[in-house]
Design a protein with these regions (language model features):
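Hydrophobic/aromatic residues located in beta-strands of well-ordered beta-sheets
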Residues: 40, 95-97, 193
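N-terminal active-site segment of His-dependent metallophosphoesterases
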Residues: 1-82, 244-248
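Flexible, charged surface loops at secondary-structure boundaries
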Residues: 3-4, 33-36, 89-91, 127, ...
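A short acidic (Asp/Glu
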Residues: 21-22, 50-54, 106-111, 158-159, ...
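Conserved beta-sheet core of the metallophosphoesterase superfamily
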Residues: 144-240
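Active-site metal-binding loops of divalent metal-dependent hydrolases
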Residues: 13-16, 44-47, 101-103, 150-152, ...
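Charge-rich, low-complexity terminal tails
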Residues: 98-102, 108-110, 234-248
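Active-site neighborhood of divalent metal-dependent phosphoester bond hydrolases
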Residues: 52-136
């Protein structure tokens, strides 16, 4: 086996567009240009979907919802992210777009207003030609890694995922870096769950300056022909990081 046989991928979780970290995103594009990935994963909560935020709608928070429009969110995401991004990836790159719980908000909204069915869905509005689209809670396997948005919100969420799924997984959802490994006593096989940092604004309006464990960053994955892998979470501190010996 040579280095050329190893597949490399990049994953971004919890972008929450338009409430994303633009500087981090620009640096991710630079990394893409440098390593030319074989696959790319948008890991869910790619769109914030704040125009259909059921928490604010159910509270009757008209001030918080003022000016939020789903059409504008789609148009801006396409022009500011997908148009630029699709031209940055190599033609051979496998592209995966996972839905997260924020994308699920839209389905919950359509449940209440079913007349929107067939018009408002992500697959009808986001430029996803050439992308594999996965619903919330679906997993996709590459090598021996299962990619998933994330499920639990407890303090030790990576441990919880390892206990329930018993697979090697990469998740997001909690906006922080966490790793847990579970080893079975039967044959010594290990399963690790990596919770990735987020690509969103670290202090959105609803956080109201509340302390958190959130960190910005993304993931880089190397997968060998037998499915074995190495996972490298990349943490961005004050909009900068070093990856593969290069300062971004």
């Amino acid at each position: 086996m040579t280095t050329a046989d190893v597949k490399v991928g990049i994953g971004v979780w919890d972008m929450h567009f338009p409430n994303h970290n633009q500087k981090l995103w620009e640096n991710v594009l630079r990394v893409i240009g440098d390593i030319k990935p074989d696959f790319f994963v948008f890991g869910g909560d790619n769109l914030d979907m704040d125009a259909v935020n059921h928490w604010e709608i159910d509270k009757g928070n008209k001030r918080g919802m003022e000016g939020k429009r789903l059409r504008k969110a789609y148009d801006d995401y396409n022009s500011e992210i997908m148009d630029q991004f699709n031209g940055s990836l190599p033609d051979y790159c496998r592209k995966l777009w996972l839905k997260g719980n924020h994308e699920l908000w839209l389905e919950q909204y359509i449940d209440k207003i079913p007349e929107l069915e067939g018009f408002a869905e992500i697959e009808r509005n986001v430029k996803l030609d050439g992308w594999e689209l996965y619903d919330y809670r679906q997993t996709v396997k590459i090598g021996k890694i299962y990619f998933h948005h994330g499920e639990y919100t407890c303090k030790y969420h990576a441990s919880k995922m390892a206990d329930v799924f018993e697979k090697n997984m990469v998740i997001g959802h909690l906006h922080t870096l966490q790793v847990h490994t579970k080893v079975t006593p039967i044959d010594g096989e290990a399963h690790s769950v990596y919770s990735m940092p987020c690509a969103c604004d670290m202090n959105p309006r609803y956080m109201k300056d509340k302390p958190s464990a959130w960190v910005n960053g993304f993931g880089v994955f190397y997968i060998m022909p037998n499915g074995n892998f190495n996972i490298y979470p990349v943490i961005s501190s004050k909009d900068h990081f070093v990856f593969n010996g290069k300062y971004y």
